[in-house]
């Protein structure tokens, strides 16, 4: 799950990388955090789309049961 602390840390590492640079450990941490963040966003979008298509499909089937 994406927490505020995760977002804060991603932002902190990003700004530090632009100002003074990151250690190898920080670069690895930044990579892992970004990977986890992107993975969760993708899963969230997939769930939303699955729900959307399920709703659209469900609605579509109902339209055939009566005359418009």
UniProtKB/Swiss-Prot annotation:
Principal location: cytoplasm
Cellular component terms per the entry's GO annotation: cytoplasm
Domain of life where this protein originates: Bacteria
Cleavable signal peptide: none
SUPFAM superfamilies (UniProt xref): YnzC-like
Keywords: Cytoplasm
UniProt cross-references to Pfam families, sorted A to Z: DUF896 (PF05979)
Subcellular location per the Swiss-Prot or TrEMBL entry: Cytoplasm
Family per similarity comment: Belongs to the UPF0291 family.
Record protein name field: UPF0291 protein TTE2340
């Amino acid at each position: 799950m994406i927490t505020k602390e995760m977002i804060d840390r991603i932002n902190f590492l990003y700004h530090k990388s632009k100002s003074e640079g990151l250690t190898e450990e920080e670069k690895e941490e930044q990579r892992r955090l970004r990977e986890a963040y992107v993975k969760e966003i993708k899963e969230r979008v997939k769930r939303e789309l699955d729900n959307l298509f399920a709703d659209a499909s469900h609605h579509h089937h109902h339209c055939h049961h009566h005359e418009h």
